[in-house]
Regions:
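A conserved mid-protein helix/loop that constitutes part of the nucleotide-sugar donor-binding site
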Residues: 18-31
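Nucleotide-activated donor-binding/catalytic signature segment of Leloir-type glycosyltransferases, i.e.
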Residues: 37-81, 138
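Catalytic binding pocket for nucleotide-activated donors in carbohydrate/polymer assembly enzymes
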Residues: 76, 81-179
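C-terminal alpha-helical cap of glycosyltransferases
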Residues: 182-203
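Active-site helix-initiating loop/hinge in glycosyltransferases
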Residues: 21-23, 99, 181
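A structural motif in glycosyltransferase catalytic domains
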Residues: 10, 26-27, 44, 189
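Conserved donor-binding/catalytic core segment of Leloir-type glycosyltransferases
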Residues: 4-20
Length: 203
């Protein structure tokens, strides 16, 4: 994949598992999305193993996308570089009880694109620049059209004037530690148990 600091970079951090993670939604629209945004030369980095890795490689070979798409086996160090280097994280999961990448990415200023389900629903709010709220992009229905819509929303955000875009990324990075930390989680569990027991916990 060519080095292009001005190109939007989409990062796939999870295994390429068609049962849960939804890579088929992306492969269905990858050619169309790249050609629609050809002047922006969008790039995709897959650092993941799984049954759809061969499908991704076949698309790259068939359309000669080697300068735009990299498909690599999972490597922890490379994955961490992906979080830091990318603009967006792709998580179109069919179901996701928890999920971690959508919480890791914003710490680096990398915004998640997710299917609105399970833990992704709990942790990703669709970005609203005018209201100064949200931390990513979510779509309601598990299909390629939904993912395509969310990726288009992400591209619209990417093309905003740099000061406006950077202000949102800065806000999201600053809010991320307060949203996702062990102290908040522990306090939430304590509150839940106290409500169930109808008394304070003795710690």
């Amino acid at each position: 994949m060519q080095v292009d600091p001005d190109a939007p970079l989409f990062f796939w951090p999870s295994r390429l598992d068609s049962i849960q993670k939804g890579p088929q939604l992306l492969t269905d629209i990858l050619y169309q999305f790249i050609h629609k945004n050809w002047d922006r030369q969008p790039q995709f980095a897959f650092v993941a193993n799984g049954d759809y890795q061969s499908v991704c490689k076949r698309i790259v070979d068939q359309h000669d996308f080697h300068h735009l798409v990299a498909v690599m086996d999972f490597d922890d160090n490379l994955s961490r570089l992906g979080y830091a280097a990318a603009d967006f994280i792709l998580m179109p999961s069919r179901f996701e009880p928890c999920g971690l990448p959508q919480m890791i990415g914003p710490a680096y200023g990398t915004l998640p694109i997710v299917h609105d389900t399970g833990g992704l629903h709990d942790t990703v709010q669709h970005l609203d620049v005018k209201q100064n709220t949200g931390n990513g992009f979510s779509f309601k229905f598990f299909d390629s059209a939904g993912l395509h819509w969310a990726m288009n929303q992400a591209m619209d955000f990417y093309l905003l004037p740099r000061p406006e875009k950077n202000a949102q990324i800065r806000r999201i990075m600053q809010e991320n530690p307060a949203l996702y930390n062990h102290s908040n989680t522990a306090n939430a569990y304590i509150e839940m148990y106290e409500q169930m027991l109808e008394r304070p916990l003795v710690l």
